[in-house]
Amino acid sequence: MEILILGHTGLLGNMVKSYFEYCNIQVNTIPNNIRWNSLEFKKFIIDNNFDFIINCIGAIPQRTKDFSINYELPIWLDENSNSKIIHPGTDCEMDNDEYGISKKIARDYIVNESKNTKIIKTSIIGTELNSNYSLMSWFLSNKDGDEVKGFTKQMWNGNTTLTWANFCLDLINNWNKYNNETILYSDCVSKYEILKNINTIFNRNIKILPYDSISINKCLVGDIKTNNIEIQIKDLKKFIEK
């Protein structure tokens, strides 16, 4: 079985690669100098004819204002490759900003028109390799004694990148069992509670100040219930320390 991971150095891709290799599953990656939408990229995908492609490439608001790759790439993969493709969905698909719209375009295409792509939809937290844009990596980049705000009214029920990778492997092994979109969800918690868990589990002493901002509920109604986020963060820490 030939598996390609796109975006293997990003937040999600680096965990999927690490987890699959930990499970003794050989994975392939695309050379960093071959960029999306180039002839070399398209030739690489088509010529290699992978059994599965896990698409972890995506543009996020912290890094760019051009989000076209979020829908152009997954649609192109579905229309032009014979591989089975796994695509990450997000709770931001409900947002009406350019990022949310770009994710929704991809989601609507896959759910309604896709021939060989399936979505694992959830919001994710995890550790990055080379940057600190995501919630967990940003938080852990602070020094002990630093003060940060913890939003008490911003609710979330996502999962760690490790949980995503674990389910991704199950999806590969049981492809026909799942619909075009599977939503993973955990217990709904506040961003403040998430930071408190990270602080404790990673043995940090960052001061988290409760902050009552406007209420935002990003909790998804899902298909598969996962462990609560405290357990997931503990499992993530154990895994990255192996």
Can you annotate each of these PLM segments?
Residues 227-242:
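Amphipathic terminal alpha-helices
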Residues 87-101, 125-130:
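Conserved catalytic-site region of short-chain dehydrogenase/reductase
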Residues 38-80, 92:
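NAD(P)H-binding glycine-rich loop region in Rossmannoid oxidoreductase-like domains
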Residues 6, 67-71, 95-107, 133, ...:
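Short-chain dehydrogenase/reductase
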Residues 1-23:
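N-terminal Rossmann NAD(P)H-binding glycine-rich loop of SDR-like oxidoreductase domains
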Residues 165-217, 240:
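Mid/C-terminal beta-alpha module of Rossmann-like enzyme folds, strongest
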Residues 104, 108-163, 169-170:
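NAD(P)-dependent short-chain dehydrogenase/reductase
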Residues 6, 53-57, 85-91, 120-122:
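SDR active-site strand-loop-helix element
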